[in-house]
Structure formats: C-alpha cells, structure tokens
Design a protein with these regions (language model features):
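Glycosyltransferase donor-sugar binding loop
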Residues: 1-12, 25-29
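Short alpha-helical donor nucleotide-sugar binding micro-motif in glycosyltransferases
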Residues: 29-30, 37-42
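A short hydrophobic beta-strand element within the catalytic core of glycosyltransferases
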Residues: 45-46
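Aromatic "clamp/platform" in nucleotide-sugar-dependent glycosyltransferases that forms part
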Residues: 50
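Short hydrophobic beta-strand element within catalytic cores of glycosyltransferases
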Residues: 67-70
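Conserved acidic donor-binding segment of nucleotide-sugar-dependent glycosyltransferases
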Residues: 85-93, 101-107
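A short, well-ordered alpha-helix in the C-terminal region of glycosyltransferases
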Residues: 108-122, 132
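C-terminal alpha-helical cap of glycosyltransferases
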Residues: 126-142
Length: 142
C-alpha cells in the first residue's frame, strides 16, 4: 500500500508481471479502514527501503502484529532489533530468498507475529518516550 517513488515504466512492468495473480494488489495510497484491513490481514510486511527517516509504517505494521521483512539500514534495524527478518539493502537475491523462506516457514512468521505488537508498543510507548526525552533535557541543562 502506498504511492511509488519508482518510475511509471517500472510500476507498469511490475503490474504486468503480477497480472493474473490475485494475491498481489497495487492499492496506491490508502488510509483509515482500508489501511487497517490491510495491516490486519497481511502475512508479512516488507519494507525494502534504501533510505528512510523514522519508518512510521514499520511501527504501524508491528503494532498490528505483523511479521516484518526489512532492509538492513540503521533506521529499520534499530526499530526491529531481532524481532524481524532482515535482508541486505539493494540486494534483490537476499530479499527474494528471505521472502521465500518466510513463505515456507509458517512457524517462524507466527513467532514474529506473536512478538511484534508487544515489543513495538513497549519500545515506543509514548509516556516512556516523553519521560526519556525530559530526562535527557534535564541532563543537558545541568
């Protein structure tokens, strides 16, 4: 789900490759109930980014209890720690292998799903983030 930063010709090629496979959806930008539905029913959330800020969609996906497959950029690995499948950025072969492994290993994906929501909600609990920020400001003002 979401827009594309890729070229129109690449998206056209992807859609052509996926034609006839009703498991693959190109939704474009979605929000609200439709986004909730997609997160709630995903088998695995994949974030193949080469560059990110704080990946809010990754936090959302994990909060819905999704197993995640992310590139090894620091912005992703610092979020997921050891609670996701990680592949080498820009390495299509590694991404393909890890995605295939996830499709083949239902138990592993199930374990990641079980851990995801509790882990991410504890790590990014708003009250704790505020407390840590205030403590940091307190240290710096001394």
């Amino acid at each position: 789900a979401g827009g594309s930063s890729d070229t129109d010709s690449f998206m056209k090629e992807l859609k052509e490759l996926a034609k006839g496979d009703d498991r693959i959806l190109f939704t474009g930008f979605v929000q609200g109930a439709m986004l909730d539905e997609l997160y709630s029913n995903a088998y695995i959330y994949t974030l193949p980014s080469d560059l990110e800020g704080m990946p809010l969609s990754l936090l959302e996906a994990m909060s819905y209890g999704n197993a995640c497959l992310v590139s090894d950029i620091p912005e992703c690995t610092e979020v997921v720690e050891d609670k996701a499948i990680i592949f080498r950025k820009s390495n299509i072969k590694d991404l393909t292998e890890k995605l295939q492994d996830a499709c083949d290993d239902i138990r592993k994906v199930g374990k990641l799903k079980e851990q995801a929501a509790d882990f991410i909600c504890a790590k990014y609990n708003w009250d704790e983030v505020v407390d840590k920020t205030l403590a940091l400001y307190g240290e710096k003002s001394r």
